Amino acid sequence: MIAISYRNGYERQRMPRQASTAFTGACLAGLLSLPSAAVGAAGLPDGFVYLREVAPAIAQDMRYYGSHNFIGRPIDGYQAPECILTREAAAAVKAVHEDLAAAGLRVKVFDCYRPTRAVAQFVRWSRDLEDQRMKAEFYPNIAKTDFFRLGYVAERSGHSRGSTVDLTLEPAAAPPSQVGARAEGPAVACTAPFAERFPDSPLDFGTGFDCMDPLSHPNSPAVPSEARRNRALLAQAMERHGFRGLPEEWWHFTFKAEPFPDTWFDFPVTAPGE
């Protein structure tokens, strides 16, 4: 399914000049998930921006660039620890951040646009039942055979449309995150008490990020009351600015007025200027 070989994510083919006028919209079906949009000045497809250029105060802990994620290694297509979003979604996330700044909080993002090649890697990994090395931390109570049925992994992801973001909140004075960092020693379950599990944020949201467990459901009554309040604070702020959540993940939100609702992209995540 992945046929992308160029830095900006487009597969290009040479054709005779006289044949170029016959290159119609029907030919684009062979490009799988990519639109015919031109590449913008930042090296991204038109309509996409780097979040740090729109809202530099938002913290970024891009988990799929490093190894601290549910697969345990860097993910295909993540060539830089950058959050890329559609222009509309980035503006809305910035508005959420500004909304909550008055309360001394800031937004921290874990994942934004996700290439389809990364989703394909998730699918392959989910079907490899021998690879269980990250189970103790990220899915301690769930069998890999149930990932698809329970909605934790899918053949397609809204992230690949560019208007979905995984995020949390933290105090504005919190120190910068170390991308992919995890303390040495035995892995602790993402469902463990707040003081014991990996500190995704100084605020308790009931589970760690990417925790595949019913406790991650936004409305789970089984998490502490403080976590429920923090989840509600995040969800209400996101909804005020045009996002909708996901029933399985408290950290996952999609901008409802997304500009590419039927297009899944595969350009790699690169740093500005690359």
List each language-model region with its residue ranges.
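N-terminal secretory signal peptides that target proteins for export/translocation
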Residues: 1-19
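Bacterial N-terminal signal peptides
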Residues: 24-35
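Extracytoplasmic cell-surface/polysaccharide-interacting catalytic and binding patches
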Residues: 39-112, 116-247, 258-274
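Conserved metal-phosphate-binding beta-hairpin within the catalytic cores
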Residues: 253
